[in-house]
A protein has these predicted regions:
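DNA major-groove recognition helix of helix-turn-helix/homeodomain DNA-binding modules
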Residues: 44-58
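Recognition helix of helix-turn-helix/homeodomain-like DNA-binding domains
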Residues: 28-43
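Short alpha-helical "recognition helix" segments of helix-turn-helix
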Residues: 21-25
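Extended, non-core accessory segments
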Residues: 1-2, 20, 41, 45-48
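A short, Lys/Arg-rich alpha-helix, primarily the initiator
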Residues: 1-16
Length: 58
């Protein structure tokens, strides 16, 4: 997945689940997740892997 593809997956999932829940489950800071979702930042590889695993396996 690319950063943009993962961002789109997060946007879709955030319509069903609270973003704070996703942050807690993945261990990614809610502010980092928010900035990523808004396209202001790209995730570091280790955070990308955590979020990708969560969004593609659940």
């Amino acid at each position: 997945l690319t950063q943009e593809e993962l961002r789109n997956l997060l946007r879709e999932r955030a319509q069903k689940e609270k973003q704070i829940y996703i942050a807690n489950v993945t261990g990614i800071d809610k502010d980092v997740l928010s900035r990523f979702k808004l396209g202001k930042i790209d995730l570091y590889p280790h955070l990308f892997t955590k979020l990708e695993a969560y969004l593609t396996n659940s």
